[in-house]
Swiss-Prot record:
Keyword Zinc listed: no
EC numbers: 5.6.1.7
GO MF entry, a single one: unfolded protein binding
Catalytic reaction list: ATP + H2O + a folded polypeptide = ADP + phosphate + an unfolded polypeptide
GO cellular component: cytoplasm
Annotated family: Belongs to the chaperonin (HSP60) family.
InterPro entries (UniProt xref): Chaperonin_Cpn60_CS, Cpn60/GroEL, Cpn60/GroEL/TCP-1, GroEL-like_apical_dom_sf, GROEL-like_equatorial_sf, TCP-1-like_intermed_sf
Name this polypeptide is given: Chaperonin GroEL
Any one Gene Ontology BP term: protein refolding
This protein's record includes keyword Isomerase: yes
Primary location group: cytoplasm
Source species, domain of life: Bacteria
NCBIfam families: GroEL, PRK00013.1, PRK12849.1, PRK12850.1, PRK12851.1
Organism: Dehalococcoides mccartyi (strain ATCC BAA-2266 / KCTC 15142 / 195)
Length: 537
């Protein structure tokens, strides 16, 4: 296909337009008085939401070059969401400020590479200072505060704190939709392991990049499945029992994987393929744990069994299976309580007998997976639109709470970034590198400015007051007062603030040194779509 190419100043103009279009849409959601954005859906009511990364993911611009700018800033939000679960709007606001300030200086004759070096040195110093300023989470009340701020609801804050109190900071917590009107919590048998779906084609929720399987039938094997010949007889048997199939295998490859994907896309069956956790003997043991939890049996090479020997009794069952690219959670397996209890006793005995610290750790992980179970938070509401918005807030609150426990907390409301600014005074740089540091200084005020602006205040006035306040003091936009942010319960997880700054600067540096863009020339009369292929397999 023929390409269109632009250079120099045209590149900066196009990228800036794309960055500004996306950032201006998202930044209105920042802070406790931020405004939601309505996203059109192809069917049904629009989704009204104030989650920055969800809004950003929905934006595609018609101009190919402007869209590149938007997609790069979207990447900053997505990386922050993946790392910390929150801070996505902050990362977009910071990226926009860094890019716009850098472009002004480039237009005035600054060298992009030297600006980039200055920005990198400033961000490295700020990250170190943020870690120094961070304080560990102390007690349940601070967990309530973190979850309340991110979830924008005290009920969500108390809910997350109560659940984490019961399952522990490393416990498995899942969030699902409910037919009720409020929040409900339950604790069920379940396990989570560090393997995700084999192919993204199995995703059922593109927004969260997750595959969710209700009333799942589970086939477990330590075999590698490569050909249709070995898969098809088993598949035909299972389809007579259930159309919701989860395959947990050493691997599914080549022809077999292609067959599953094609049938999934055609709607012939609802399927998810996941790699089995662990390796060697540990993999066999974990598959056996899974089989006991779900009431099935492992189709094992050691037992001389092939896939075509599968029977209904071999299949495990669970109320729900959720898988992303990294993890899979089995919820409410239908295994016998007595069998699970006996398996836990067996693992305990192995822990006592082993002399290897590594083996003991892995056995304890298996024991925790069977003993701990899974906490389920069911989110309900009067309408589907409200329910999805609530669910997104609960997910963000949970992710932010885990981040706070891991790296500690800072004063919230953008104050943590402003408190770290003095560390830049120690950087003795010259020329364009010093200008790069100044660009970062200007960008760091933007989160506070936009929190205040969205609350109907003059953002610049609020920023000046916060800068001249004691360390840890900032602006409470919810109550329109200044004071000690920690005492007012306004705190941010250090990981969220650090990730937002790190990812915003990374994307900004990429944008400011880019000097040419290449895109396809769009056909004004595109070809009609291919007709759907008939038949199964």
């Amino acid at each position: 296909m023929a390409k269109q190419i632009i250079f120099g100043e045209k590149v900066r103009v196009s990228l800036k337009k794309g960055v500004d279009t996306l950032a201006n849409t998202v930044r209105v959601t920042l802070g406790p008085k931020g405004h939601p954005v309505a996203l059109e859906r192809k069917w049904g009511a629009p989704t009204v939401i104030d989650d920055g990364v969800t809004i950003a993911r929905d934006i595609e611009l018609p101009d190919a070059f402007e869209n590149m700018g938007a997609q790069l800033v979207k990447e900053a939000a997505t990386r922050t969401s993946d790392a910390a679960g929150d801070g996505t709007t902050t990362s977009i606001v910071l990226a926009q400020a860094l890019i716009n300030e850098a472009f002004k200086n480039i237009a005035a004759g600054a060298e992009p590479i030297n600006l980039k070096r200055g920005i990198e040195k400033a961000v490295a110093a700020l990250k170190a200072q943020l870690r120094k300023n961070s304080t560990p989470v102390k007690g349940k009340q601070q967990i309530v505060q973190v979850a309340t701020i991110t979830g924008k609801d005290p009920e969500i804050g108390n809910l997350i704190a109560d659940v984490m109190d019961k399952v522990g900071k490393d416990g498995v917590i899942t969030i699902e939709e409910s037919r009720g009107l409020r929040y409900e919590t339950s604790y069920v048998e379940g396990m989570q392991f560090d393997r995700g779906y084999i192919s993204a084609y199995f995703v059922t929720d593109p927004g969260r990049m997750e595959s969710i399987m209700e009333d799942a039938t589970i086939l477990m094997t330590d075999r590698k499945i490569e050909t249709v010949a070995e898969l098809l007889p088993a598949l035909e048997k299972i389809l007579q029992i259930s159309k919701n199939l989860v395959i947990v295998a050493e691997n599914v490859e080549a022809e077999a994987l292609a067959t599953l994907v094609v049938n999934k896309l055609r709607g012939n069956l609802n399927i998810l393929a996941v790699k089995a956790p662990g390796y060697g003997d540990r993999q066999k043991a974990m598959l056996e744990d899974m089989a006991i939890l779900t009431g099935g049996h492992v189709i094992s090479k050691e037992a001389g069994r092939k896939l075509d020997s599968v029977t209904e009794a071999d299949l495990g069952h669970a109320r729900r299976v959720v898988s992303n690219k990294d993890k899979t959670t089995i919820i409410d397996g239908e295994g016998s309580a007595e069998a699970i209890k006996n398996r836990i006793k067996q693992i305990k005995a192995q822990i006592e007998e082993t002399e290897s610290a590594f083996d003991r750790e892995k056995l304890q992980e298996r024991q925790a997976a069977l003993v701990g179970g899974v906490a389920v938070i069911a989110v309900g509401a009067a309408t589907e639109t409200e329910m999805k918005e609530r669910k997104a807030r609960v997910e963000d609150a949970l992710a932010a709470t885990r981040a706070a426990i891991e790296e500690g907390i800072l004063p919230g409301g953008g104050t943590g970034l402003l408190n770290a600014l003095p560390c830049l005074d120690a950087l003795k740089l010259e020329g364009d590198e010093a200008t790069g540091v100044s660009i970062v200084r200007k960008a760091l005020i933007e989160p506070v400015r936009w929190i205040a602006t969205n609350a109907g205040k003059d953002g610049n006035v609020i920023v000046d007051k916060v800068k001249n306040s004691p360390v840890g003091h900032g602006y409470n936009a919810e109550k329109d007062v200044f004071g000690d942010m920690a005492e007012m319960g306004i705190i941010d997880p250090t990981m969220v603030v650090r990730s937002a700054l790190e990812n915003a600067s990374s994307i900004a540096n990429m944008v400011l040194i880019t000097d040419s863009l290449v895109a396809d020339i769009q056909d004004k009369n595109p070809a009609p779509p291919m007709p759907e292929a008939p038949g199964m397999y």
